[in-house]
Amino acid sequence: MLTTLTAEMNAYQVALENFDLAADALDLDPSLRAMIKYPERVLSVSVPVRMDTGQIVRFEGYRVQHNTARGPAKGGIRYHPNVTMDEVKALATWMSWKCAVVNIPFGGGKGGVTCNPKRMSAGELEHLTRRYTSAILPLIGPEKDIPAPDVYTTPQIMAWMMDTYSMHKGYPVHSVVTGKPVSLGGSLGRNEATGRGCFYTIQSSGSNLGIPVKGARVVVQGFGNAGSIAAHLLDSAQAVVLAASDSTAAIFNRHGLDIPKLIMHKERTGSLSGFPAAETITPEELLSLDCDILIPAALENAITGDNARAVHTRIVAEAANGPVTPEADRIFAEKGVFLIPDILCNAGGVTVSYFEWVQDESHLFWDENDVNAKLERIMTRSFNDVFKLHQERNVNMRLAANMLGIGRVAEACRMRGLYP
């Protein structure tokens, strides 16, 4: 079972440490540091929900706006038993830098509700979503803060959020959230965007490092939206996906898993458990497999100082947010592992969310080929920007990405000044 936090360091401590490292490397002015290090707004809400039994259960919800100097706050909503305020603050912080790295006009936001959606009915999830949306309604809006899907939230949940907001306004407001169903103003290609963006950064890494995708041995930790799509695209490019895991099982086949069949099995059963033609292994064994590309696509702090030395790979592609702790970063640097940092690797999702927002605001929609072509251009350009800084400043890729993102946010704050 994968957990969100470890005893080593919580996600927000990781975010702050990585900020300080980048700010030091940039020699950032102390006044700018003070302006952009911490969240602008932090909201905690009580969310009472009438369950199917008639009992009223109270859930804890959060919405954090980290920085809006470059545009409206942007970031997903997650439903998970381990959601905490510190986790949401960390994710909002990373969203600020992520949007800046891919140079889209958004700031960083994030939200979540501490709940177990797997044990809730569709009706209970709808009630929870509408109550939570009503509670954070003063903070959100197409020009203020635009939520999106995240862990265990779906296009249907985004549709309920959009409807709740619209009912309060008295007219349809499609652009208040992204990741919606296409029938409600969602964008073609949005569902695959995070995994597709990850794939593009892996391609770019391979080109620069001389590691071709064809024949590369891949391990995927986390087989949700991002992990499964990345695995599918790599499999289509003739990589060999040796192993995959979700919250219930880790499986391995030395000759390569049949990814199309594995995706169908997961859709049918909700789990990787019981997939034929695969050996069950432990999560620890999965991370220690000899491979060329490791994709941590689950939750934060999956790879720490305790297990990083057991990892045997050439590339780590962070499809999840914050899966590698600073101590694990240092170990990977010692071992010569090339890491594609989360704020670059998984930025495909927010990039196509931006496309969706643009399409909703303009009432003009693009076909899927246009969406994917625009995404590839942005992800490739952004990778090249980070890789260039990595080489010029002789810093690791995470520090280079943070320097690029934080530098752009700092410049926006500097140009805007301080009001009043």
Regions found by a protein language model. Give the residues of each.
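Adenosine-phosphate binding glycine-rich loop
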Residues: 2-10, 205-206, 310-420
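Conserved active-site and cofactor/substrate-binding residues in soluble primary-metabolism enzymes
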Residues: 10, 14-17, 83-86, 120-131, ...
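General beta-strand structural signal in soluble alpha/beta enzymes
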Residues: 90, 146-148, 171-177, 220, ...
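Glycine-rich phosphate/diphosphate-binding loop of Rossmann-like nucleotide-binding domains
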Residues: 181, 186-288
